[in-house]
């Protein structure tokens, strides 16, 4: 039997519900002073009457206007970022490896406090920060700055129920659905993170639809809108089956510079999934099917999002996949016969001259860099191999699948539900056009960033270092 409520409904809350249906842009958050304490801030829904008046008026309502982004607790977040602490980092030499020589750090503790402590030694020195903060879905938001709370305390904090178990306002989800706490948590940390970046440093932040808008606004304020470099879309095969309408298969990666004017240009990176495409191409070539059949298979393969950027590399030989390009050049006067290797007849030429001298062309033919047709009626083309053209500017849409990383983590019995793929982090780190700098990750989780940095160094001989920061969470008893 349900517990009886010996009081009338909260008509104000019901009226706010009704207004929210008609004018959702008029609903905001405000501090609930009645149910708040110095230790616990409780928020409630409220109506922005200035906006409501405007919604009900055909004319512009008098009053000062200002473009601003604010929330309950914003000023407190700024104060928190600037507040000094009386703590220090304590070395754990017995748990460390190569303590006297390592240049890498793994720090356990609240990342807000750690960021403050790092100001002394790393102020203005870091070239790159990568973070994968909680996406504010409720269960993953553990970074409230008094962060250990029971569900009952959490419900009380956001005003879901009062001490008599009466619902204070309509909100059937967790505190993560209210953006104020998340914005406060991120804002203070972004302020401190910016201090640590060098003038030519950059920060990358993974996020999804829940907070991409608020994160972009926070970063615009902390770093300046002019310093936002890009918002990457990260596409994946892994659908998140948590939506009633659309199967979400993408996330975002926000990239911001400390100062875009001094950030090094020429962000040439290795094309994503190039190793995989080269491997598949070689397997097709070695399968015994004809060259034309291999070409047809690759034409079909590049229609998949994972291989979109290789849509021209649909031929393959003993060197790997290549694209066929024009051998002529506008205004060229280099005209001579190029003989077909089978028919021994001069190949067809266009209205323009060859792009190479006769000596250079002979060398290209000898080195098997020329693609001939079935006979001399087809113009020869130049082979441009993928392995020689693997680096290019990063594209704003990237394809990475986190399923393989999740499976690897589970196989290793690590208790992290949504780890980022190592190749994905390697790609991010490789964007920066140097290989001797320190990467900070203050939401390090399973330390995928550290893994990626070490693996990338092993591949290209770089000397990148890392600083990982993670809350000292309890491990699952079944993990090793």
What is each residue range found by the language model?
Residues 47, 227-245:
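Short, surface-exposed recognition loops and adjoining beta-strand edges that mediate ligand/DNA contacts
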Residues 162, 169-232, 467:
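Conserved Class I SAM-dependent methyltransferase catalytic core
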């Amino acid at each position: 039997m349900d517990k009886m409520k010996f009081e009338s409904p909260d008509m104000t809350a019901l009226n706010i519900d009704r207004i929210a249906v008609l004018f959702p842009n008029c609903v905001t958050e405000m501090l609930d002073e009645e149910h708040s304490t110095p230790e616990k801030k409780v928020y409630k829904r409220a109506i922005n009457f200035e906006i409501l008046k405007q919604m009900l008026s055909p004319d512009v309502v008098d009053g000062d206007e200002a473009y601003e982004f604010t929330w309950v607790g914003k000023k407190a977040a700024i104060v928190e970022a600037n507040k000094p602490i009386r703590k220090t980092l304590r070395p754990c030499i017995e748990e460390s490896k190569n303590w006297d020589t390592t240049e890498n750090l793994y720090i356990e503790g609240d990342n807000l406090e750690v960021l403050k402590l790092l100001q002394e030694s790393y102020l203005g020195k870091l070239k790159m920060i990568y973070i994968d903060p909680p996406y504010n879905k409720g269960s993953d938001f553990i970074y409230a700055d008094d962060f250990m709370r029971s569900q009952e305390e959490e419900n009380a904090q956001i005003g879901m129920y009062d001490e008599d178990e009466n619902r204070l306002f309509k909100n059937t989800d967790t505190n993560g659905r209210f953006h104020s706490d998340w914005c406060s948590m991120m804002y203070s940390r972004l302020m401190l993170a910016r201090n640590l970046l060098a003038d030519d440093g950059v920060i990358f932040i993974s996020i999804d639809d829940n907070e991409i808008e608020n994160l972009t606004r926070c970063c615009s304020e902390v770093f300046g809108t002019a310093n936002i470099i890009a918002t990457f879309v990260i596409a994946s095969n892994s659908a998140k089956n948590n939506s009633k309408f659309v199967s979400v298969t993408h996330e975002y990666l926000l990239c911001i510079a400390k100062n875009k004017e001094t950030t090094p240009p020429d962000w040439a990176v290795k094309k994503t999934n190039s190793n995989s495409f080269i491997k598949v191409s070689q397997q097709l070539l070695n399968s015994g099917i004809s060259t034309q059949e291999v070409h047809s298979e690759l034409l079909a393969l590049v229609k998949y999002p994972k291989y979109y950027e290789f849509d021209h590399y649909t031929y393959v030989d003993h060197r790997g996949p290549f694209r066929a390009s024009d051998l002529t050049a506008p205004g060229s006067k280099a005209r001579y016969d190029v003989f077909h290797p089978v028919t021994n007849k001069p190949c067809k030429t266009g209205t323009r001259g060859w792009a190479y001298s006769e000596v250079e062309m002979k060398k290209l033919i000898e080195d098997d860099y020329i693609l001939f047709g079935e006979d001399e009626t087809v113009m020869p083309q130049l082979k441009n191999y993928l392995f020689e053209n693997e680096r290019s500017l990063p594209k704003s849409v990237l394809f990475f699948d986190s399923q393989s990383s999740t499976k690897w983590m589970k196989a290793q019995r690590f208790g992290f539900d949504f780890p980022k793929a190592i190749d994905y982090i390697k790609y991010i780190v490789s964007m920066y056009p140097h290989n001797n700098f320190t990467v900070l990750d203050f939401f390090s989780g399973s330390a995928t960033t550290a893994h990626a940095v070490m693996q990338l160094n092993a591949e290209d001989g770089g000397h990148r270092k890392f600083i990982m920061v993670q809350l000292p969470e309890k491990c699952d008893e079944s993990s090793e």
